[in-house]
Amino acid sequence: MAANGGDHTSARPHVVLLPSAGMGHLVPFARLAVALSEGHGCNVSVAAVQPTVSSAESRLLDALFVAAAPAVRRLDFRLAPFDESEFPGADPFFLRFEATRRSAPLLGPLLDAAEASALVTDIVLASVALPVARERGVPCYVLFTSSAAMLSLCAYFPAYLDAHAAAGSVGVGVGNVDIPGVFRIPKSSVPQALHDPDHLFTQQFVANGRCLVACDGILVNTFDAFEPDAVTALRQGSITVSGGFPPVFTVGPMLPVRFQAEETADYMRWLSAQPPRSVVYVSFGSRKAIPRDQLRELAAGLEASGKRFLWVVKSTIVDRDDTADLGGLLGDGFLERVQGRAFVTMGWVEQEEILQHGSVGLFISHCGWNSLTEAAAFGVPVLAWPRFGDQRVNAALVARSGLGAWEEGWTWDGEEGLTTRKEVAKKIKGMMGYDAVAEKAAKVGDAAAAAIAKCGTSYQSLEEFVQRCRDAERK
């Protein structure tokens, strides 16, 4: 059936996945590929762009295609030439988004050769992938790689801008966004880039938001009990002017996948030597670096808390560029002072392994969506410290759902001032010493487990999507 091998048969629908750049986007696509191939009887091809922006992306793709073959295959998606100087100083991941978007016409021959039953595109590429799929009669679905709340904003934001334009409010900036049927997203929580109408990300976000109503369906890595208001509003279509919206498939939390057995990492050996629920795990994701002065305040706060901690430090946007000296980053003597009760690394870690470990009692997180769904899956309390993008929208969910707490006054990218060591230490002590925090997070974990169980809402939702792919295969 597919051009890259003879194992794909008409008995199994063939789903082509089109991820975009960044681990926050690629990880859920890898998990979806395995879930579809191993749990729901699909053949899967992943349109992979090389080279990747980061080393972590390259490692993940290599592991996926080795371990999940032959049910999961690579489709080499070669990009058209792209002049990055058109967007001086732009984020390297946003540049890759744009380069991939402009190469969308090249996706057509891949779909033709693969004889795809369906295309699942990243939301970042939706507005350019949808016409290509439509031309070929291939059903086009979107995998939304953030929360249902953020999907609501994406779907509603074009109408919000249109209403402002009609009222003559162009140029006054984005304010509070009241999404019908959902809730208010305060101005301070709207992703920073969306306040600039000329920003590359804003242009992509609006174009993709406008096209959502034309897609065949939207998969979201969340579960009904985690975001009941947003999921209900999306399914009822109350967030759109027309009152219509495609089917929404809540398929999360998509579970992490270990592709191969490896030697136990040194950070895991360290974790195993710590008492139950005694360790604070600190990670701000793979996408952004914290400014050095704030990094040192965080270091001092962790030290002052007196708690054990495992900290993954990042100093650059792209991991290939991360050559900083750890001791120099965190201040003279810090590593020596916390030796024994802390493990600090700049290396890549398997976060899902850490969050599953019984010694972890708190997760200080930037609120990237993959991180939050992993914390929810394992019932680990979260201290939310959003830094940019969708992360304040996600942090609000941490507080609403009972997964943890969000100190709304703590600074994020572009804001003046520092979150002090005293604030950090106080919050850590409070959350680590309060049993109700762990109990509420554990309830979220129970709800997540129920959702992905065979009769659960997320399992059934993914099966409904697969059945649509089977039906398309028969036509």
Curated annotation (Swiss-Prot):
Tissue expr: Expressed in radicles, hypocotyls and juvenile leaves. Expressed at low levels in roots.
GO molecular function, one term: flavanone 7-O-beta-glucosyltransferase activity
Keywords: Glycosyltransferase, Transferase
CDD domains named in the record: GT1_Gtf-like
Keyword Zinc-finger applies: no
Residues holding UDP-alpha-D-glucose: 286, 348-349, 366-374, 388-391
Keyword Glycosyltransferase recorded: yes
Enzyme Commission number(s): 2.4.1.-
Pfam families: UDPGT (PF00201)
InterPro entries in the cross-refs: UDP-glycosyltransf_plant (IPR050481), UDP_glucos_trans (IPR002213), UDP_glycos_trans_CS (IPR035595)
Function as written in the Swiss-Prot or TrEMBL entry: Bifunctional glycosyltransferase that can produce both C- and O-glycosidated flavonoids. Converts 2-hydroxynaringenin to isovitexin. Converts eriodictyol to orientin and isoorientin. Converts naringenin and eriodictyol to naringenin 7-O-glucoside and eriodictyol 7-O-glucoside, respectively.
Family: Belongs to the UDP-glycosyltransferase family.
PANTHER family, per database record: GLYCOSYLTRANSFERASE (PTHR48048), UDP-GLYCOSYLTRANSFERASE 708D1-LIKE (PTHR48048:SF76)
Protein name: UDP-glycosyltransferase 708A6
